[in-house]
Amino acid sequence: MTPEQSPLGKPSAYTEQYDASLLFPIARKNAREAIGIGAQLPFFGTDIWNAYELSWLNARGKPQIAVATFFVPADSPNIVESKSFKLYLGSFAQTAFESMETVRDTIKRDVSASCGATVSVHLTAPYEFGKLQMEEFEGLSLDRLDLDTDVYHPDASLLTAALDEAPVEETLVSNLLKSNCPVTGQPDWGSVQIHYVGPQIDHAGLLRYIISYRNHTGFHEQCVEKIFLDVLKACKPVKLAVYARYTRRGGLDINPFRTNYNLPMPDNMRLARQ
């Protein structure tokens, strides 16, 4: 299925009775082929989704709530289109379930089937909400740089590195990532953390490159994979990890992580803008 066939950007009838058919899968393949990624992926990782508007009824009709977190493996053949995900989660609102575990297992089954891979699901109950603390990305802020730029479409030629010098290890951070939904044109605001080992990347060029996504249209996952691939090709790091966290829309935030070396999956930290 293509994004144009999805419910995104179209009037939708909201249902409050559970309906797994609302989930709309989109194949990762086409977007990856467009940037030169074939069947052999140059990375592994996960997409972390957080859903803040999940509610259902218990067996006695009393509303229940939870914050849901989903871990979608980067090698899954599909992603779930975000509006369909919102509609699907909304369909739980007037449906009775025996327990929170039943809700979790139902969501895990449905979303895994839609993505074509096993998706991990965690539900945070209200008594645990106090543990959901805000954090910020660790690393050197690129946003401190005072620079000029007029490039607002992705341009990998902005990326340079000291290829003839000794390798370094750095973690660089920017809150200036912005792209746009390819279906609705709505802005997607994000923060990005880039950790690498290799030739030192020119900081000003990297910041200009991140800013160059400002008028780009692409889903969150696609943007992060393009950033990963462009940095890998232009700057030739031995190790590279890219983690972006986007602000929520429709009660959902999406946070893709890609790496080419063994790392634990990143913390599902909530940034201030999320």
Curated annotation (Swiss-Prot):
Binding site for substrate: 80-82, 220-221
Transmembrane segments: none
Class of enzymatic activity (EC top level): oxidoreductase
EC code: 1.7.1.13
One Gene Ontology CC term in the entry: cytoplasm
Domain of life where this protein originates: Bacteria
UniProt pathway annotation: tRNA modification; tRNA-queuosine biosynthesis
Protein name listed in UniProt: NADPH-dependent 7-cyano-7-deazaguanine reductase
Keywords recorded for this protein, A-Z: Cytoplasm, NADP, Oxidoreductase, Queuosine biosynthesis
Organism: Paraburkholderia phytofirmans (strain DSM 17436 / LMG 22146 / PsJN)
Matches recorded under Pfam families: QueF, QueF_N
